[in-house]
Amino acid sequence: MIFRSVSNTDFRARVRTLLLAGSTALAFVAAPVWAFSIDDVASKAKDLAGDKYSAPTSNLPSEFSEMKFADYQQIRFINERAYWGKLKTPFKLSFYHQGMHFDTPVKINEVTATTVKPIKYDRTKFDFGSLKFDENATKDLGYAGFRVLYPINQADKQDEIATFLGASYFRVVGKGQVYGLSARGLAIDTALPSGEEFPRFREFWIERPKAQDKQLVIYALLDSPRATGAYRFVLRPGKDAVMDVQARVFLREKVSKLGLAPLTSMYLFGSNQPSEQHNFRPELHDSSGLQIHAGNGEWLWRPLNNPKHLSVSTFSVENPKGFGLLQRGREFSRYEDLDDRYDLRPSAWIEPKGDWGKGTVELVEIPTPDETNDNIVAFWNPETQPEVGKPLDFAYRLHWTMDEDELHDPKSSWVKQTMRSVGDVKQKNLIRQQDGSTALVVDFEGPALKDLAPDAPVTTQVSTDSNAEVVENSLRYNPVLKGWRLTLRIKVKDPKKPVEMRAALVDEAQKPLSETWSYQLPADE
């Protein structure tokens, strides 16, 4: 190292210069850099919660508010005019026009590195088909919602991968998937006699993505008569779509039931509840069951029903590790529907971040005569609600996937299918005779079973409530699946009441070999 001598004066001058330069650099680093965050939305939500609720008012002319669904379908967004269409970013936005019950606009803003600006309604971005209307009456309208476009399936084609439309509903798909079940921001008093309250996203802020970005960040402000909230969504497209959700909710007043991370789906009929009418489709549903991974490590599977009466089931859990509505069984032969492709509809799996404490996973099943009604709801209901005006912070990861095998305990086994039929017994002449029982056939498969010998000492743990008598509980090896088949025949004591039952496979030491099968036979069936 070479030392160069300097005078004291030069040295002091150089030190003073360096100190000044350093202080300038420090000042530059310390200077606040503008950045939009969930705190900005939460501030608005908190202020809203302190004010009296003001219901949104419709600004739609009658020719739009009174239109039929077929007319609303004629209104098509011109994708060539997508927002960010000329920017070098893989994400684009298209918009929903107001119409029918989508009669109030939502504010949509774009967030850049330096500004927030509203995305204004532009009628010229839509093709209205053969609809006739006064163009002047639409000049001050807004958008009902928006879609996210991304080249998920082909590099040169923009596909719709997410949609936000109506109340606090949103849907997402991954590669090769088609829209099925929905998620919501918040559910209030679901299935209560007082009636359900549907909070709505009233304003959105969407970050303009850079060319290299593989994720899209969306903020939303939620409002309802008894709650407000701030939400941050980070959407990551892929084979499975993944969405990280961060929320801060404020109550205006106490609610009877608070539903966090709600999912909404449809179940019309399936193998565990066959159609009463002849139908070439063996099954017709967006989801086949509710899966729960409890904080104590237990895995539970509850096949869905389309009951004749409203049904609410609760599952007490502390610090859930996951829950969701899954579409188990991807074989096309289960559905045989070339138009609606129920075999390609995703499962939605909620993975809580942090400890959620004590509460219940609630499952609501509503009677429906057809597939146009969403009749299934699942959500987390915390045991303790926040005080009025105080924030409730929670976060979770939401997976939209067709790879249900990744959502099991990799060392256990699970229910492949549940089948229901009238019960019968085989007579000495080999003719089967119905005996007034109901038969439930449950196939289990998975790593815990596939390497066991057919004569391995696998047994069952079965329980039912007091409304049923078990007349058969048999277990046999299933060589097709390299698993085991459980057959239960029960006789219902009071058909006007449902029957609850549970079953699991265990080894000779009573150690679990499978998830818990939890089933409800609906009333009046």
Swiss-Prot record:
Among SUPFAM superfamilies, the record links this protein to: E set domains, Galactose mutarotase-like
Q: What is its main location?
A: periplasm
GO CC entries:
outer membrane-bounded periplasmic space
Q: Where is the signal peptide?
A: 1-35
Subcellular location as annotated: Periplasm
Pfam families in alphabetical order: MdoG
Q: In which pathway does it act?
A: Glycan metabolism; osmoregulated periplasmic glucan (OPG) biosynthesis
Task: Please provide the record's keywords in A-Z order.
Answer: Periplasm, Signal
Q: Name one GO biological process term.
A: beta-glucan biosynthetic process
Q: Name one GO molecular function term.
A: carbohydrate binding
User: Keyword Signal, does the record have it?
Assistant: yes
Reply yes or no: does the keyword Ribosomal protein apply: no
Q: Which domain of life is it from?
A: Bacteria
Give the function comment from the record.
Answer: Involved in the biosynthesis of osmoregulated periplasmic glucans (OPGs).
User: What HAMAP family does its record include?
Assistant: MdoG_OpgG
Q: What family classification does the UniProt entry report for this protein?
A: Belongs to the OpgD/OpgG family.
Q: What is this protein called?
A: Glucans biosynthesis protein G
